[in-house]
């Protein structure tokens, strides 16, 4: 590996009442969405031709069965905790879990749970732990969860063994797409005036892959600290778009440039020209 690759799954579970629930899951390797799992399906859907990685059919079936058991146990546990703690529906639960592979074939895993949008607990090592500032009832939840040795062992196995093994194969199978390099195009313009005697300079960068990029307004060799970066937006072809602005006095615009650094450029930064 030349760089780290995080593999993370997002689970969203909605409990409307004691009989009406739904759980949907999505997974990403880096910035590429690789899997989805609808509440209405018993099977995980592949979003890439290489989404099975190097696992054979039997290995993948075993993982899918373990995750299916996990999904059922989460639903059961939530309903049990509602009764035990006298909680009220509706309940929203989010789980963010996975592992990150680093150069040297090392990995680290993570498993975080949010209740009603608030981070409440995490799985670390072999045990569940409360997050800082959580409601008092979460301590009781953690105590009960830590008594369930079977589920804890299953999560340890998934996080520490299955996930790194699967993700290593996923990276190998998807290497050509993961290592794809697409050069950015960049152009300058001016935006709506921020005020009397002011200019908003806009540097647009588009069509680049992978996502990490550095875009900075410059005066000579000096980075301009008031450079403001917008959100990364996806293009239809899987590349990215970014807008970076600088608010300056009209008389100070001369001599400013926009510098774009990206891995596809081989160290040759680009400086688009206003025009």
From Swiss-Prot:
Family annotation (CDD domains): IgC1_CD1 (cd21029)
Presence of keyword Ubl conjugation: no
Compartments where located: Cell membrane; Basolateral cell membrane; Endosome membrane; Lysosome membrane
Sites where the protein binds a D-galactosylceramide: 77, 148-151
Sorted UniProt keywords: Cell membrane, Disulfide bond, Endoplasmic reticulum, Endosome, Glycoprotein, Immunity, Immunoglobulin domain, Innate immunity, Lysosome, Membrane
Tissue-wise expression: Expressed on cortical thymocytes, on certain T-cell leukemias, and in various other tissues.
UniProt keyword Cell membrane present: yes
GO biological process: antigen processing and presentation, endogenous lipid antigen via MHC class Ib; antigen processing and presentation, exogenous lipid antigen via MHC class Ib; innate immune response; positive regulation of T cell mediated cytotoxicity
GO MF terms held by the record: endogenous lipid antigen binding; exogenous lipid antigen binding; lipid antigen binding; lipopeptide binding
Gene Ontology CC: basolateral plasma membrane; endoplasmic reticulum membrane; endosome membrane; external side of plasma membrane; extracellular space; lysosomal membrane; lysosome
Glycosylation, residue list: 17, 39, 105, 160
Superkingdom of origin: Eukaryota
InterPro entries: Ig-like_dom, Ig-like_dom_sf, Ig-like_fold, Ig_C1-set, MHC_class-I_related, MHC_I-like_Ag-recog, MHC_I-like_Ag-recog_sf, MHC_I/II-like_Ag-recog
Domain Ig-like stretches: 164-274
Protein topology in the membrane: Single-pass type I membrane protein
SUPFAM superfamilies per record: Immunoglobulin, MHC antigen-recognition domain
Disulfide bonds: 99-163, 203-258
PANTHER family: ANTIGEN-PRESENTING GLYCOPROTEIN CD1D (PTHR16675:SF175), MHC CLASS I-RELATED (PTHR16675)
The protein's role, per its UniProt record: Antigen-presenting protein that binds self and non-self glycolipids and presents them to T-cell receptors on natural killer T-cells.
Remarks, miscellaneous: During protein synthesis and maturation, CD1 family members bind endogenous lipids that are replaced by lipid or glycolipid antigens when the proteins are internalized and pass through endosomes, before trafficking back to the cell surface.
Quaternary structure annotation from Swiss-Prot or TrEMBL: Heterodimer with B2M (beta-2-microglobulin). Interacts with MHC II and CD74.
Name of protein: Antigen-presenting glycoprotein CD1d
Organism field: Sylvilagus floridanus (Cottontail rabbit)
């Amino acid at each position: 590996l030349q760089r780290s690759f995080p593999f993370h799954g997002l689970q969203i579970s909605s409990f409307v009442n004691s009989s009406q629930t739904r759980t949907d899951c999505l997974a990403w390797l880096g910035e590429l969405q690789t899997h989805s799992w609808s509440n209405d399906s018993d099977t995980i859907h592949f979003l890439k031709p290489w989404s099975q990685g190097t696992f054979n059919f039997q290995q993948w079936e075993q993982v899918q069965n373990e995750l299916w058991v996990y999904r059922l146990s989460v639903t059961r546990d939530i309903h049990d905790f509602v009764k035990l703690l006298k909680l009220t529906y509706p309940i929203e639960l989010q789980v963010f879990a996975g592992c990150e592979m680093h150069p040297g074939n090392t990995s680290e895993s993570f498993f975080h749970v949010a209740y009603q949008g608030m981070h409440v607990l995490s799985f670390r090592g072999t045990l569940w732990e409360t997050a800082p500032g959580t409601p008092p009832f979460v301590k009781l939840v953690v105590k009960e969860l830590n008594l369930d040795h079977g589920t804890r062992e299953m999560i340890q196995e998934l996080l520490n063994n299955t996930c790194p093994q699967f993700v290593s194969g996923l990276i190998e199978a998807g290497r050509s797409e993961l290592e794809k390099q697409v050069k950015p195009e960049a152009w300058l313009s001016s935006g709506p005036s921020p005020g009397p005697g002011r200019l908003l300079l806009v540097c647009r960068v588009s069509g680049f892959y992978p996502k990490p990029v550095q875009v900075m307004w410059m005066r000579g060799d000096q980075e301009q600290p008031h450079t403001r970066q917008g959100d990364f937006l996806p293009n239809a072809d899987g590349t990215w778009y970014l807008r970076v602005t600088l608010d300056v006095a009209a008389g100070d615009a001369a001599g400013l440039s926009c510098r774009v650094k990206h891995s596809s450029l081989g160290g040759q930064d680009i400086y688009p020209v206003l025009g």
